[in-house]
Each structure stands twice: as C-alpha cells, then as structure tokens.
Amino acid sequence: MHLYTQTLNTVTGLLANEGSFGLNLDIFEANLINIVILGGGIFKLGSTALSESLAERQQKIVGAIQESEERLEQAVTKLTESEKQLAQAQLVITSLKEEAEATAKQVKSGILTDGKAEIERLTASAKGQIGTIEKKIRKEISEYVVTLALQRVTLQLEGKLDVNLQQQIIDKNISKLEG
C-alpha cells in the first residue's frame, strides 16, 4: 500500500511540474476520429476472428466430448462383453473341473477294479501254476518211487528168478491179455 501511495504522489508531482493536466476535446487535433475508427475496426475484425476462433474451439471441444462419450460407450460395451465372457469362462472352468473330477473318479475306480481283477487273475494263475508244479512233482516222485521199487524188485528177483519162473510169469500175462 505504501508503494501505491508513493507512486501516486510521484505522478501527481510530475503533472504539477508540467503545468496542467486536462483532456484535449478537439477531436481533429487529438485524432479521436481515427482512434474511434481504428478501435471499431479492430473490434469488428477482432470480434469476428474471436467469434470464429471461439466457434472453432467450441466445435473441437464438442467433438472431443462426443468422441469421449463414444469411447466411453464402446468401453462400457466392451466391459459388458468382457464380463459376459468372464462369466462364461468361469462356467466352462467349473464344468471342466466337475468333468475332470468325475473322470478322475472313474479312472480311479477303473484302475482299482482293473487292479483287483489283475490281482485275482495273477492269484488264479499262480494257483494254477502251483497245482501244475505239484502234479509234475508228484508224477516225478511217483516215477522215482516206481523206478526205485523196480530197481529193488529187479535186484531181489535177479537172485530168485530163474528161467522157468520167468516163463510162467510171461505165460500168465499173455493169457490175461488174450482173455
């Protein structure tokens, strides 16, 4: 505020030193008509240019707003579509999970069933092989026992069996076969 007062005092002092302060109302001497014409022309041309500039700017702003609104609508549409696709994808994922769980249960059940069947088949096969091996071993043991018995009888008969006794045994067996 002090600077304002000081500046006002300085201007007043300068005007007082110059002599007088006043308005020159002589329009020709003061070139007032030219100033008014120039001011009017500037106002007319400036207002037209300013109006055009403002109108152009307004159109750009309106265009930008409309473009933004269109983009917003497109974004909302895309968002809605994306949400629908997400919901569908979640349904598909849920469905796939359920199918996978059901398939896993079926596969597990199938594997267990197949495993049990395979175990039963292997058990039956093993029992059959054991039975076959037992029969083979019994046959071999029987053959061995018969062989040993024949060897023993042969050894016993070699000392007791003469040609007449052998002929009688052969004749008996032949008569049995004929009869």
Curated annotation (Swiss-Prot):
Membrane-topology descriptor: Single-pass membrane protein
Transmembrane segments: 35-51
Miscellaneous field: In plastids the F-type ATPase is also known as CF(1)CF(0).
Protein name: ATP synthase subunit b, chloroplastic
UniProt keyword Transmembrane, yes or no: yes
Species in which this protein is naturally found: Emiliania huxleyi
Subunit structure and binding partners: F-type ATPases have 2 components, F(1) - the catalytic core - and F(0) - the membrane proton channel. F(1) has five subunits: alpha(3), beta(3), gamma(1), delta(1), epsilon(1). F(0) has four main subunits: a(1), b(1), b'(1) and c(10-14). The alpha and beta chains form an alternating ring which encloses part of the gamma chain. F(1) is attached to F(0) by a central stalk formed by the gamma and epsilon chains, while a peripheral stalk is formed by the delta, b and b' chains.
One term under GO cellular component: proton-transporting ATP synthase complex
PANTHER family reported in the protein's UniProt record: ATP SYNTHASE SUBUNIT B, CHLOROPLASTIC
Function text: F(1)F(0) ATP synthase produces ATP from ADP in the presence of a proton or sodium gradient. F-type ATPases consist of two structural domains, F(1) containing the extramembraneous catalytic core and F(0) containing the membrane proton channel, linked together by a central stalk and a peripheral stalk. During catalysis, ATP synthesis in the catalytic domain of F(1) is coupled via a rotary mechanism of the central stalk subunits to proton translocation. Component of the F(0) channel, it forms part of the peripheral stalk, linking F(1) to F(0).
Family (UniProt): Belongs to the ATPase B chain family.
UniProtKB keywords: ATP synthesis, CF(0), Chloroplast, Hydrogen ion transport, Ion transport, Membrane, Plastid, Thylakoid, Transmembrane, Transmembrane helix, Transport
Chief site of localization: plastid
Any one GO molecular function term: proton-transporting ATP synthase activity, rotational mechanism
Subcellular location: Plastid, Chloroplast thylakoid membrane
